Each structure stands twice: as C-alpha cells, then as structure tokens.
Design a protein with these regions (language model features):
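Glycine-rich FAD pyrophosphate-binding loop
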Residues: 59-77
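Extreme N-terminal leader/targeting segments of oxidoreductases
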Residues: 1-40
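N-terminal Rossmann-fold NAD(P) dinucleotide-binding loop
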Residues: 51
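N-terminal FAD cofactor-binding segment of flavoenzymes
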Residues: 71-105
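FAD/FMN-dependent oxidoreductases across multiple families
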Residues: 249-362, 366-370
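C-terminal helical "tail/cap" subdomain of flavin- and related membrane-associated enzymes
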Residues: 21, 360-442
C-alpha cells in the first residue's frame, strides 16, 4: 500500500474497504426490549474514531459489540484530521493518507503587525493528514468483518446498567461513552462531568490547494496579531488544504481576531462560534491566503467577498482538560474523557490510543478473562498514568494565554533547538501512542 510522499498533492492509492448497504440494522423489539440482543459484551455510544476503533479491537478478541450513533458513518467531521503517520500505519489505514508532513512551521503574528521569519521545526517522526470519512468507513468495515453490529439511534443517557436511546434500551457487560465532548452517558450519571468553561472552540474550512504551488508542513499562526488566546492553522492535505482558527477558553471575555478585547467579537468559548467565522475570514483573507485557492488555480487574492461565503464549514468544541476516565459503570474515551492535548488541541491520536486499550479490555470481558469491574479498574489505571501529561499541557495553555508577543516569541524560540524539540516531541508521543498497544497481545 503506498503512502503520499512529502508535499505530494495526490491522494494515495490504497485499499478501499466497502461498507455493506445495510450497515445499520433496523431497531427491532424483542419482547419489551429493542435491538437485536438483550445484552452485548460491549455497547458503545458514538461511531467516530474512538468508538469505531474500540469496537474493532473488542470484536477481534471475540466480544459481541454494538455501536450506536444517530449519524451516518463518516459524517459529522469536526477534526483537522492530522496525526502521526506511524499511528495510521499501525491501524492499517495508510490508504486514507492524503499528505505526509515532516516539518512544523510557526508563524508569529504580533499585534504590531511586524512580520517575523517563520520558525521551522524538523519533526522527529512524520505526521500525516488523512481523509476523515474514509478512515471512519474503513474502521467500520473492519468492524463489520469481525461481527460488530451498528444501530442508528440517539443516545440519551445511562440508567440501571442500560444505555438509553430514543429507540429503546440495551445492556452491555461493559459500556463505553465515545459520543464526543457532550458525553451523554457520563453526564447522565455525573452532570458535572463536562466543564463548559474548559472547552476550546474551533472552526475550519476545507478548500482547494493552489496545485501549481502546493504547500507542505503543518503550519500554525500565533500571537496577538491573530486570534489570541488560540491560534490559526493550515494543514495541506493533497488536493485540498484545511484552514482553521481555534479559541482557547482562557479569553476571560470577548476577544477579536486581532487580539483586541474591544474591537471585535471573538467571545469566550460559550459564545466563540459567533466570532470564529469572522476570525476565519480574516485569516483566510490575510496570513493564510497563499495556502488556498478558490478553484485550485492561483492562490486567493483579497476581494469584496468573504472567503467563507457559500462554503461548508465544520468544527466544534474541544475538551483540552482531562476528565474522569470512568464514571460509574461507564468508560469514557476520546473527547468524552477530555482526551485532547492542551496547547495543540490534538485529540485524534489520544482517542485512538485510549480506544485501543478500552477495546482490548472489553475483549477480555467477552472471553471471560476478567470481569467488567476489573476491566474498568485496568482502564482507570491506564488513563491515570497518562493524566499528568494532559494536565501539564493544559497548564501550559493557560500560562501561554497570559503572555505578550515577546513572551510568545521567546517561548517558541526556546523550544526550537533540535535536541530540546526532539525531547519534547518524544514525550508528546509517549503520552498517547497506539502503536505499542497494537504490537502486544491484550
């Protein structure tokens, strides 16, 4: 299976798994209950990265698995879709890779408007942008091949050891909440599980790359001359590029796209989406203009039309503060557990890592190797061991939000020397790396 080389703007050739047209079964009634069975070894709420991967790993070990989601597989993208190439290779998902990146580039944008030379960091291991829909469909197809069942329903809570949906109830020996930042199962048990004041908010457009001058590398813009506290980004992905803006919750009040607390409406996270579109337009019309094209031809040039006009945008809230990994009888994975790194807001790799482990533990429940209670305890220990790193990055995010442009520049330059950056990146990978888990038996 081939992988797109650095800077290659072509979608790589790869295995395209085909989903059956009857992926979702019609919910049926068995006596007073719905669904095909009364009890599964594992019931999962949510069919994005975390839920699909946990389902695949559990079913591979012989567990009976049900995945419940109201949306079609591969729809509802909220991610910028970049992770380590090694993670995609270990999952058998290199066919979804759109472009490989070996550099990270930081563009500092001070409020003064003075341009600084970009800081280029050579990555010690490659990252890749990938096709969200295809990855989800591939994972689902893998799951179907090992017996995973899917039901289309809206999950509303957890009660009396049963997952409650708008189409009935179903019981699992083990239950996973992988339904996103809202965590409907966990919050039905512990309403304070979700802290809205800890949520960042992002908005992104996927637009054509200028194919005659495609970009490479993962690009970030930071400073009081752009959205701050937060950042903007451009992630080239083959024929397209993803440009977005992110607002951290540490604003403390309305913040504009140019960093002013009075001249715009960036908003705290609870109202950030109102100003994010304006911030995204300013970014696409300014620093990000060279990275995209309206039609794949020349790069964008400023006009009277806002860049996002008529375009589909995606995004949402990002929980960059770790939550409890187990709530009552429910295991939380991915955004439901706050498994997004502070500062970078990367969540895909963490979702994959914790999903693999949760799926392996569920497989042990299905085989009788251990009890559901033991599985929850083992998952709690696994998550707790990694929690300090997530807490550290959340603290760094809050600390950086207090810095001026000089402080941001000094911090960025301090991390640039090769040995320092490589050490930081080795720790960054260790905290959430699915590769070792996929190389060892459960």
């Amino acid at each position: 299976m081939s992988v797109a080389p650095d800077g290659d703007a072509r979608t790589p050739a790869g295995v395209r798994r085909t989903l059956p047209t009857t992926l979702y079964f019609d919910v049926v009634t068995i006596g007073s209950r719905s669904f095909l069975r009364e009890t599964y070894d594992l019931v999962i709420a949510g069919a994005s990265f975390a839920g699909l991967l946990a389902a695949r790993e559990a079913a591979r070990l012989g567990a009976s698995v049900l995945v419940i989601d109201a949306q079609a597989i591969g729809s509802g993208q909220t991610s910028a879709c970049a992770t380590t190439l090694g993670a995609l290779q270990a999952l058998g998902m290199t066919g979804t890779v759109q472009q490989v990146h070996r550099e990270m580039v930081i563009h500092l944008e001070p409020a003064s408007g003075r341009q600084n030379d970009p800081l280029t960091f050579r990555l010690p291991y490659p990252f890749a942008t990938f096709d969200y829909g295809q990855l989800c469909r591939n994972l689902a197809a893998d799951g179907v091949a090992v017996g995973v069942e899917f039901a289309r329903a809206r999950v509303t809570g957890y009660d009396a050891s049963e997952v409650v949906t708008d189409r009935g109830r179903v019981r699992g020996k083990l239950t996973i909440d992988a339904a996103g930042w809202r965590a409907p199962l966990a919050t039905s048990i512990a309403p304070a599980h979700v802290r809205r004041d800890h949520l960042s908010c992002g908005l992104e457009a996927e637009v054509p790359q200028p194919l005659r001058s495609p970009a490479s590398g993962l690009h970030f813009w930071a400073g009081h001359g752009t959205i701050w506290p937060g950042y903007a980004w451009a992630f080239p992905a083959g024929a397209v590029t993803r440009l977005g803006v992110l607002a951290f919750p540490e604003t403390g009040g309305p913040v504009s796209a140019n960093g002013s607390s009075k001249s715009g409406t960036m908003g705290t996270v609870n109202g950030a989406s109102v100003g994010l579109r304006t911030a995204l337009d300013r970014f696409m019309d300014g620093p990000g203009a060279d990275f995209w094209s309206p039609d794949g031809g020349p790069p964008w040039r400023r006009s009277d039309t806002a860049p996002t006009t008529g375009r589909h945008l995606h995004g949402g809230f990002i929980p960059c503060s770790p939550r409890q990994p187990v709530v009552g009888e429910v295991i939380c994975v991915g955004d439901a557990a706050g498994h997004c790194f502070g500062l970078t807001a990367e969540g895909i790799r963490a979702a994959m890592t914790f999903a693999v482990r949760a799926g392996q533990l569920a497989g042990g429940v299905g085989s009788g190797r251990w009890s559901a209670s033991d599985a929850r305890a083992m998952y709690w220990r696994f998550a707790t061991m990694r929690r300090p790193y997530f807490t550290l990055l959340n603290w760094l995010q809050r600390w950086l939000a207090t810095l001026g442009d000089t402080g941001i520049r000094l911090y960025s330059e301090a991390a640039r020397p090769g040995p320092i950056f490589w050490f930081l990146m080795s720790q960054y990978r260790w905290a959430a790396d699915p590769v070792p888990l996929l190389r060892i038996p459960a």
